[in-house]
Amino acid sequence: PSDARGGQILADVTKDRKIKSVAITYTNNDYGKGLADVYKAAVEAHGIKVTTVTAHEDGKADYSSEVATLASAGGDAVAVIGYLDQGGKGIIQASLDSGAFDTFVLSDGMIGDSLTDTFGKDLDKSFGSLPGSTGKGAGVFKSVAEAAGIDSSGPYTGESYDAAALIILAMQAGGSADRTSISQNIIDVANSPGTKIYPGELKKGLDLLAKGKKVDYEGATGVTFT
């Protein structure tokens, strides 16, 4: 889903958790700013007070000054729109160390096992939202990933897998690695008619295309292009 949809869903969850006021910090790039803008508008539409909206830079060793700014504005929680291995993690660490916040609203880029491995029960009051699929492909992808020793729970793991698979299939369908050829064939391999291709079946799809057959790539996320 788009950031617009993701921000709205995160705001809906915030309302459901009975949060009355929230401070927002976002990673200082287009992803962070765009999602923060959508989230702010959506929570305010729910009657939730936004106490402050501030950017943070990734790659810093210490985020105590950023957290001090957030804490001075206050809020029942702080929404951390960023990355779990970058500044977002630092914001959480500094918040817990200072006692400024103990409830964190987490964007999709903040959700992953490494965060819970690091903070454990300190995140018990926290919540977030992550795009995903509940179709057949999602279950197949989880099994395939686990068999390969890969964590399938990270943000956009299935989407990344599908993107790579679609490019490979489009290259096979067009007989070329040329960008124009890929763009011309990617819709055909992602849509019906054709044999459905699920995670772990890339070779099957390539073999069918080599024989002049049609494929309909479902993948991990139920891919369909219009």
Region locations from a protein language model:
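Extracytosolic ligand-binding ectodomains
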Residues: 1-226
